[in-house]
Amino acid sequence: MIKDITIGQYVPGDSFIHKLDPRVKILISLIYIVDLFIVNSFKGYIFIVVFTLISILVSKVQFTYIYKGLKPIFILVLITAVLNIFMTGGANPPLFKWKFLVVYREGLIMAAFMALRLVFLIIGTSLLTLTTSPIELTDGIEKLLKPVSKIGVPSHELAMMMTIALRFIPTLMDETDKIMKAQIARGADLESGNLIQKAKNLVPILVPLFISSFRRADELAMAMEARCYRGGDGRTRMKELKLSNRDFIASLCALVLVCISILSRIWWGK
């Protein structure tokens, strides 16, 4: 299940979304995340679902990639939903009560909203990395952070760090999966015992994982040094980022979604 995490992976393609300017894709992703928290009604989420499905179809990314990305967070979504069910109070009489466990209608609604937000949050961020190459992502983040570089903020270095961290997620997950299988093959018991024992069982995984991470970081640093990497000063690009008509169309669609989200909150919100 660990190797199924899709955040940080890139799937090459020539779809409409693949060809969008990375700056536009990053901004649309941020707008999409904000929309998830603006909408507070199930009717409003219908538009979120439609926008998401259209984006997936236009990107030509297989639904299996999206499904694989959702599998690892199933437990997180379930725990979040359960906590919201039992920890959200309500003005109406409870639907269920047993000792200290009380379930209100408001708790069920909040649990459904939080589950939806988590699911679509993962889908949105996964779609960004699945359709944007590491170089494009770095250039896009650097361009967006360029205004703050005038006050001394190292925009290129920040963009590089964020991109490397994001791209290392699938690598680390794959490494973790290999280490777990190797330890199980050697007779390690990772499942039995109480919570404390399970935490102790993770030591044979975490130690080699940290060693592997430091080794990969050192190899990456040596590779960058061998290629005379000296930061963003004076760096040229093979392809300069330029906005096109498709970028304006995508931005317009995102703005329409924002307007619909705000109106849905006004019309159907609590």
UniProtKB/Swiss-Prot annotation:
Origin: domain of life: Bacteria
The keyword Iron-sulfur is assigned to this record: no
GO cellular component: plasma membrane
Entry keyword set: Cell membrane, Membrane, Transmembrane, Transmembrane helix, Transport
Compartmental location: Cell membrane
Transmembrane domains' residue ranges: 36-56, 72-92, 108-128, 248-268
GO molecular function, one term: transmembrane transporter activity
Coarse class of the protein's main subcellular location: membrane
Keyword Transport part of the UniProt annotation: yes
CDD domains: EcfT
Membrane-topology annotation of the record: Multi-pass membrane protein
Function noted in UniProt: Transmembrane (T) component of an energy-coupling factor (ECF) ABC-transporter complex. Unlike classic ABC transporters this ECF transporter provides the energy necessary to transport a number of different substrates.
Homology family: Belongs to the energy-coupling factor EcfT family.
Oligomeric form and interacting partners: Forms a stable energy-coupling factor (ECF) transporter complex composed of 2 membrane-embedded substrate-binding proteins (S component), 2 ATP-binding proteins (A component) and 2 transmembrane proteins (T component). May be able to interact with more than 1 S component at a time.
HAMAP family, A to Z: EcfT
Descriptive protein name: Energy-coupling factor transporter transmembrane protein EcfT
Naturally occurring in which organism (per UniProt): Clostridium kluyveri (strain ATCC 8527 / DSM 555 / NBRC 12016 / NCIMB 10680 / K1)
Protein's gene: ecfT
